[in-house]
């Protein structure tokens, strides 16, 4: 199951706190990339945030990926389930 996660650091987070925790998040993302849980990650320019595509086996695994992020308590995120265009097209054809 693939998910798009858009994460932005809360504006009220002090710069010192953010600067301390951000390197921990970088290491965490590297670990998830090695485990093949993160397929893609990008920094959102000018947003103090990131965009990830994660590939997990369950909602429990997704919760773990999100909950263990060092910036979990200092960020807001939106999560979108993803599917391929081909699967979406197949589902639409079945409806017609």
Please state what every model-predicted region is:
Residues 1-96:
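Conserved, structured core segments of small domains
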